Amino acid sequence: MELTPREKDKLLLASAGMIAERRKARGLKLNYPEAVALICFEIMEGARDGRTVADLMNYGRTILTADDVMEGVPEMIPDVQVECTFPDGTKLVSIHEPIV
């Protein structure tokens, strides 16, 4: 199977997001890379499901709370940006202060 660098990046992010999702389900507090991966993964999946950019920007702030992550992680993530493929093309989704 031949993948472009962008496809490899998306696959790696999806894998990391699924691992973070499992750890969160087990009650573990997520670290910085896990938190970012989970937020990005959920946003990418939402785009694939047909949600709008505005909807995903709002949804991105509800994925994780400060109780879901290790101490200090919310302050380390002032914003998250992820390129997603929508039916009408690729768009950048920005989530400001994703963990409250």
Swiss-Prot record:
It catalyses: urea + 2 H2O + H(+) = hydrogencarbonate + 2 NH4(+). The keyword Cell inner membrane does not apply. Its EC number is 3.5.1.5. Gene3D superfamilies: Urease, gamma-like subunit. GO terms for cellular component: cytoplasm. Pathway: Nitrogen metabolism; urea degradation; CO(2) and NH(3) from urea (urease route): step 1/1. It is found in: Cytoplasm. SUPFAM superfamilies: Urease, gamma-subunit (SSF54111). CDD domains: Urease_gamma (cd00390). The keyword GTP-binding does not apply. Keywords: Cytoplasm, Hydrolase. One of its GO terms (biological process) is urea catabolic process. One of its GO terms (molecular function) is nickel cation binding. Belongs to the urease gamma subunit family. Heterotrimer of UreA (gamma), UreB (beta) and UreC (alpha) subunits. Three heterotrimers associate to form the active enzyme. This is Urease subunit gamma. It comes from Aliivibrio fischeri (strain ATCC 700601 / ES114) (Vibrio fischeri).
